[in-house]
Amino acid sequence: MRPPAFWFTPPDSPALAARLLAPLGQAYAAATARRLRAPGHRAGVPVICIGNLNAGGTGKTPTAIALMQRLAARGIEAHVVSRGYGGRLEGPVEVDARRHRAADVGDEPLLLAAFGRAWVARDRAAGVRAAEAAGAQAILLDDGFQNPSVVKDLSLIVVDAAVGFGNGRCLPAGPLREPVEAGLARADLLLSIGGPEAQRRFATDWPALPVPRLTGRLATLQMGMDWQGARVLAFAGIGRPEKFFASLRAEGAELLRAEALDDHQPLGEALMKRLEIEAMALGAQLVTTEKDAVRLPPSFRQKVLTLPVRLEFDDATALDAALDRLGLAARS
């Protein structure tokens, strides 16, 4: 399901639907606050939570990849622990791309496993214990900011600068899992992802936030593919597929058709065959995201191109300082 438009009206002028649903949003926020009072497991290694306040995609996966690579460059073996949304395995189990599929462990953990060791566990505390026992020197929690089962040593909140915190209301009246003020009071860093205009708008709409702010953008990873003038049929089942389509256009591709799928939507044979027939009729190449690509049926993996993106920080000084404080300085 796509999020309703009224979630993203200005906070000072909420839509009628948001006002009508406000009591339910307040109840949701109260339930979250009660849940967060529960005690959590404290690991023997630093735990870094990559979370968000909004429901849906904000850029956590590229942020996790960037942190894995940053810690690896410091000589730190970081393991990712994910709940494995969309997968059938309860875990804790280490993701193995040679034997696991997205239907087993979820698409995000399968993608993250290409960059380091990743675990899936419905019980996050059990996943953290398993990762620590397997030699993790640091643990990245993929999501879980609103889950108290694991004590976090550093919480990094990720927000899409283009949409900010929406109308500032909690589910179902808005996109938030908890109020902005309450969430940021527990956070250590805020990362807003987007281009210059989106960053300026975010800073205007959400000024004076009580947490150090990092900024960054998603940049296309150059793989030798010349997209200029390429005729493509693009499809994406991510939080905001329009960002992927915009990236293709920015690379110069001729986007003949854009199919926005639901986040984590299964890519079955029937759907892929339909898209293949449409692409052939248009004389277009099928293109998708890295995260969607791990859900492709085996028969389509050689037929679909991907446009990989990576997070680039504008200034990571505050992040590096936070990692140093956790004892994760570069090791020889």
Swiss-Prot record:
Keyword field contains Plastid: no
Gene Ontology biological process terms, A to Z: lipid A biosynthetic process; lipopolysaccharide core region biosynthetic process
Chain residues that bind ATP: 54-61
Pathway assignment: Glycolipid biosynthesis; lipid IV(A) biosynthesis; lipid IV(A) from (3R)-3-hydroxytetradecanoyl-[acyl-carrier-protein] and UDP-N-acetyl-alpha-D-glucosamine: step 6/6
Any one GO molecular function term: ATP binding
Transmembrane segments: none
Keyword Nucleus: no
Catalytic activity: a lipid A disaccharide + ATP = a lipid IVA + ADP + H(+)
EC number: 2.7.1.130
NCBIfam families linked to this entry: lpxK
Protein name per the record: Tetraacyldisaccharide 4'-kinase
Gene name of this polypeptide: lpxK
